[in-house]
Amino acid sequence: SAFELQNKTQEPLTGRKFEFHLFPLTYRELANHSQELMEQRLLNHRLVFGSYPEVINNQGNEIEVLKLLADSFLYRDLLMLENIKKPEKLVKLLQALAYQIGQEVSYNEVGNTIGLDSKTVETYIQLLEKSFVVFRLPSFSRNLRNELKALKKIYFYDNGIRNALIASFQLLEGRQDIGALWENYLVSERRKKNFYQRFYGNSYFWRTKEKQEIDYLEEADGGLKAYEFKWKEKAKHRISKTFRNAYPNSEMALIHSGNYDSFLH
């Protein structure tokens, strides 16, 4: 696992240091391998089962493979290597985070739910970040008093792992969490894309106390790009007027299932 490799390679290096991350396969890698139209046809499958190579190469056995990945990598490796004192709490934390993708996460609230103090929750989340299971997205705040400043959203690097944690593998049609799966997929894919393409800007979400929000922001070279995510191609949605007035020079776009390819290339 990534965390095991990290533990084994802590020796200091002289000179320049390069850091390499191996994520689940990206949209671009899969599209280049099997042609873009074919990959787009598999979008529903990716939202449920993710993009780990083991899953891609074992069609028909996705659930079994994901359960093995979760059991061996998340539970056994993490619990063994970090010597976690309350392993059952880490499992509950992962499940709580899986149910909250696309939502602001309060360490206090999560801790109260699973029986841990907020500091321990944060420590466990940092461990999960080091092992490339989840990552945090901070809130953006510059101009307005009513912008949320302290909360963070937490996303999984892979939708399949998220679904494995809560044993939720039903087909996309009829699911109540399509919006959350779509947001997690887009944000995680964009994160992988930006890393591989050496994008050195910052990423955020934006929300006010009145619950006006922007799903995803990127800030680079003095510019700001705002993105709203909607699953349905014909969904009508306007970027928050409050945001537009506060940041009038921002670029703004709606990303849906009919145009997402340009967002991930």
Give the location of each predicted region.
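Interdomain motor-coupling "hinge/lid" segment immediately C-terminal to the ATP-binding subdomain
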Residues: S1-S106
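A cross-kingdom feature that marks ATP-driven nucleic-acid transaction machinery
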Residues: Q126-L127, V133, P138-H265
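A short acidic, leucine-rich amphipathic alpha-helix
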Residues: N108-N112
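Short amphipathic alpha-helical interaction segments
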Residues: L116-K130
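Secondary-structure boundary/capping positions in well-ordered alpha/beta enzyme cores
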Residues: R16, L37, D117, Q197, ...
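Conserved phosphate/pyrophosphate-binding and hydrolysis machinery centered on Walker-type P-loop NTPases
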Residues: I56-E64, N83-P87, Q100, I114-S118, ...
